[in-house]
């Protein structure tokens, strides 16, 4: 067997070179360099020394064991649960134990004195065994050396081949490595499972140990079946990443088996999408987990033009969701209003009589407020602008027969909604009809409101003191509308009164009380209050003020109330005379302070125990109102898509409206919007209650709007802004004037109408030929005047056969500008020679006529 160097021997026995040189020195072998050769005799000498160092002699220790240990540590980089790389230390421990084969044969006791031939034979046996061991060790060393050299040569050839492949592959992977910087920083083995498996696998035989060495990730990948030659989607564009497994052999095998394929879903993902009443396109795309442009494309395919922030209704959303293959489910929103209705159901308590609520209705200027003025013994009408009522007045009057709550409604046509609200909350309607005017349009409307509300009527025939008064005429006209007097067999009381002199007022109150007794009006006094908003306004010093009519229960100062979209705690209450009150019972009108905003007239008022619940319901109602408003606006946009293209041809008057109370703002807004036509439109930019502020002026300037203040004024900042920005600001106290001014502004935007006016008619008597004009008609002017330069029509049997213009007008060979009736003339028609006797030539002119609404 060939000699080996110290370095090779250290690899065979698994001992560091420095330690082996030290052991050789202790055994008496002089070695100073790792490349120095060690002979077979020196190896045996070292073996003998090692045996002695373990407390064994050459003879006694031959039957004992020798153990060799080896420990190696490697580091692996693995990906953690959050995608971060971490280093794991892997320690491999190996142990080899060598036992002499014929242990029983050398177990003879040393103390016995053996004969000399036996000793010699034993010595020969030992020498023979040592020689066999030496030869076996030399053979094993030779084979290991040959295997190592062969493996080294194969490794070098493989490395050269793979280096060329690696260079080509790196070129192709450059783009992927730039996108996956995190993958490029982490260099891991192909799988953690392989590394762990290699670390804990049973070690090979001792003879194969020299050929074992730590291989790099590239070499392990080479031996596992070849390098990847292409990039794969399944590897997430990270061709340099190796770590995929969790440590188990089965998982690693499955990962290796499937890492070269595309991972595609086996079935389409079907989602259940909960849809509210309205939602934007962006919100729907988020629910569907798709990009908004794809959803917009689908909507366009269905004929719906929408942007990402545009709202669509539930029906449209359902159609597009089903078109995309998903399931649409209507969102079940918890209806807080229903819960509130159950929680605030009418309390069961002792019912006590309550005063009647009486609404005075009728045509404008028929004396409604004057009648109430006489009853209240105050001058209410003098305080109304123009002597007409502009909003509902609620008053509680004590009479000799008990209390009565009166509601005075406007009679003007613009206040239809106010009268409808008055009929809704009332018990009895007093219909005031002027004895001299009779039944008028608003009188008929008041009858319809009362019948729709199912409220009994008492007719007050007013102005009975006038000489031209005719009460029977009123009865006849009302009977046409099924209002039959009692004396005619009906059920309606007719009372003749004079609001100016007080005639018949007591009889009217008696009739009201009689009707109230028949109705047996009762309401619970105890418990939380409920009522309705009669009117609301924004007071500069006190904030939102609402006139509330209590219908049941008792409203106390400090109660938490909810009305429409507003809520708040009652900070103060005042009666109709402005005196503070602490509580109000059924049928009592009071002004309430402390709401979060001005509620709409007609909203229900409820008292709640919890302010948090009131806020929750108010916010819920605001959300519903916003959704419905958004849906309405969107529907209008979609319906008017083509009309908006021609919007430049439509004249528009922009109005910013501020009024003293909510009802007046609503009435004026409705009246102004009714003035719109197909050619001119009134656009209300904003409408509200309260004084005119600087922000209102800025808004009006930006939108080029006219600012209308109805019973309100601009503050100092607003007046300064008006002067600087030259905004048109107008104050009104009578609704007629506001409507008339806006109507005039709209009239100015109307394009003038072109009308044709016939100015002359001539009868053709004969036709002459002219070398200059061709056919010339000799005519007699029958009507009007024939003028040169005006357009004409040629009529035959009263049918127009030609339209053109006069080319020449002559009288006795002289050119003239006009010819009057009864005079002969010659008329040459331009570009027309088919004039015949008996035809008529009609001369007309186009006149611009200003249009009115």
Curated annotation (Swiss-Prot):
Main location: cytoplasm
Region (G3): 408-411
Localization of this protein: Cytoplasm
Domain tr-type G: 353-522
Biased composition (Polar residues): 75-84
Spans annotated as G5: 498-500
Spans annotated as G4: 462-465
Gene Ontology MF term list: GTP binding; GTPase activity; guanosine tetraphosphate binding; translation initiation factor activity
Biased composition range(s): Basic residues: 238-247
Keyword GTP-binding: yes
Keyword terms, alphabetized: Cytoplasm, GTP-binding, Initiation factor, Nucleotide-binding, Protein biosynthesis
Domain of life from the UniProt record: Bacteria
Biased composition (Low complexity): 189-200
Region of interest (G2), residue spans: 387-391
Region (G1): 362-369
HAMAP family in UniProt: IF_2_B
Function: One of the essential components for the initiation of protein synthesis. Protects formylmethionyl-tRNA from spontaneous hydrolysis and promotes its binding to the 30S ribosomal subunits. Also involved in the hydrolysis of GTP during the formation of the 70S ribosomal complex.
Homology family: Belongs to the TRAFAC class translation factor GTPase superfamily. Classic translation factor GTPase family. IF-2 subfamily.
Name under which the protein is recorded: Translation initiation factor IF-2
């Amino acid at each position: 067997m060939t000699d080996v160097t110290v370095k090779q021997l250290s690899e065979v026995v698994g001992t560091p070179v420095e330690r082996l040189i030290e052991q050789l020195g202790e055994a008496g072998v002089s070695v100073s360099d790792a490349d120095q050769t060690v002979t077979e005799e020196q190896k045996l000498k070292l073996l003998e020394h090692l045996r002695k160092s373990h407390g064994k002699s050459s003879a006694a220790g031959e039957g004992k064991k020798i153990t060799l240990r080896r420990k190696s540590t490697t580091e692996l980089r693995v990906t953690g649960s959050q995608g971060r790389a971490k280093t794991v230390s892997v320690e491999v421990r190996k142990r080899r134990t060598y036992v002499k084969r014929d242990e029983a044969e050398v177990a003879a006791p040393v103390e016995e004195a053996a004969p000399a031939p036996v000793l010699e034979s034993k010595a020969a046996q030992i020498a023979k065994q040592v020689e066999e061991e030496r030869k076996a060790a030399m053979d094993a060393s030779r084979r290991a050396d040959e295997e190592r050299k062969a493996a080294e040569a194969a490794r070098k050839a493989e490395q050269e081949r793979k280096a060329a492949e690696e260079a080509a592959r790196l070129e192709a992977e450059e783009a992927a490595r730039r996108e996956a910087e995190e993958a490029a920083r982490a260099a891991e083995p192909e799988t953690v499972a392989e590394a762990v498996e290699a670390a804990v696998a049973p070690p090979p035989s001792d003879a194969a140990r020299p050929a074992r060495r730590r291989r790099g990730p590239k070499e392990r990948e080479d031996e596992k079946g070849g390098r990847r030659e292409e990039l794969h989607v399944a590897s997430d564009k990270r061709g340099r990443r190796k770590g995929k497994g969790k440590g188990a052999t089965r998982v690693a095998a499955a990962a290796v088996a499937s890492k070269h394929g595309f991972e595609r879903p086996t079935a389409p993902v079907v989602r259940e999408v909960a849809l509210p009443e309205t939602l934007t396109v962006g919100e729907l795309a988020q629910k569907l987990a798709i990009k908004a442009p794809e959803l917009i494309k689908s909507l366009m395919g269905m004929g719906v033009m929408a942007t990402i922030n545009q709202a669509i209704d539930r029906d449209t959303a359902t159609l597009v969701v089903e078109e995309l293959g998903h399931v649409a489910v209507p969102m079940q929103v918890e209806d807080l209003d229903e819960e509130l209705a159950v929680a605030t159901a009418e309390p069961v308590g002792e019912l006590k009589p309550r005063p009647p609520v009486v609404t005075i209705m009728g045509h404008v200027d028929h004396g409604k407020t004057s009648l109430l003025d006489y009853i209240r013994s105050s001058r209410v009408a003098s305080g109304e602008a123009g002597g007409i009522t502009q909003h509902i007045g609620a008053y509680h009057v004590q009479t000799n027969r008990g209390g009565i709550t009166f509601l005075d409604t406007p009679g003007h046509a613009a206040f239809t909604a106010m009268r409808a609200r008055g009929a809704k909350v009332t018990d009895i309607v007093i219909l005031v009809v002027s004895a001299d005017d009779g039944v008028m349009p608003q009188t008929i409307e008041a009858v319809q409101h009362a019948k729709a509300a199912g409220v009994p009527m008492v007719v007050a025939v007013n102005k009975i003191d006038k000489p031209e008064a005719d009460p029977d005429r009123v009865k006849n006209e009302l009977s046409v509308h099924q209002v039959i007097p009692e004396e005619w067999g009906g059920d309606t009381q007719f009372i003749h009164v004079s609001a100016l002199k007080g005639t018949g007022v007591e009889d009217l109150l008696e009739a009201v009380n009689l009707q109230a007794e028949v109705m047996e009006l009762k309401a619970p006094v105890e418990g939380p209050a409920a009522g309705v908003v009669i009117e609301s306004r924004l007071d500069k010093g006190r904030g939102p003020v609402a006139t509330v009519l209590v219908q049941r229960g008792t409203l106390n100062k400090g109660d938490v109330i909810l009305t429409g979209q507003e809520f708040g705690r009652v900070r103060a209450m005042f009666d109709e005379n402005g005196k503070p009150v602490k509580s109000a019972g059924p049928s009592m009108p009071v002004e309430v302070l402390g709401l979060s905003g001005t509620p709409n007239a007609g909203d229900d008022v409820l008292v709640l125990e919890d302010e948090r619940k009131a806020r929750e319901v108010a916010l819920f109602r605001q959300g519903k109102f916003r959704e419905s408003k958004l849906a309405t606006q969107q529907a209008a946009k979609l319906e008017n898509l083509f009309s908006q293209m021609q919007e430049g041809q439509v004249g528009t008057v922009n109005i910013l409206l501020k009024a003293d109370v909510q009802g007046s703002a609503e009435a004026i807004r409705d009246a102004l919007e009714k003035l719109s036509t197909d050619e001119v439109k009134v656009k209300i930019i904003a409408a509200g209650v309260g004084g005119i502020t600087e922000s209102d002026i800025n808004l009006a300037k930006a939108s080029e709007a006219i600012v209308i203040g109805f019973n309100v004024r601009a503050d100092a900042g607003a007046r300064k802004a008006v002067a600087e920005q030259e905004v048109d600001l107008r104050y009104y106290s009578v609704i007629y004037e506001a409507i008339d001014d806006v109507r005039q502004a709209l009239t100015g935007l109307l394009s003038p109408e072109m009308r044709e006016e016939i100015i002359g008619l001539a009868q053709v008597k004969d036709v002459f030929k002219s070398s200059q004009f061709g056919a010339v008609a000799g005519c007699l002017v029958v009507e009007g005047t024939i003028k040169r330069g005006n357009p004409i029509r040629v009529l035959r049997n009263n049918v127009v056969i030609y339209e053109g213009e006069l080319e020449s007008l002559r009288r006795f060979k002289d050119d003239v500008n006009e010819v009057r009736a009864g005079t002969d003339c010659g008329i040459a028609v331009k570009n027309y020679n088919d004039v015949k006797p008996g035809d008529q030539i009609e001369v007309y002119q186009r006149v611009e006529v200003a249009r009115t609404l």
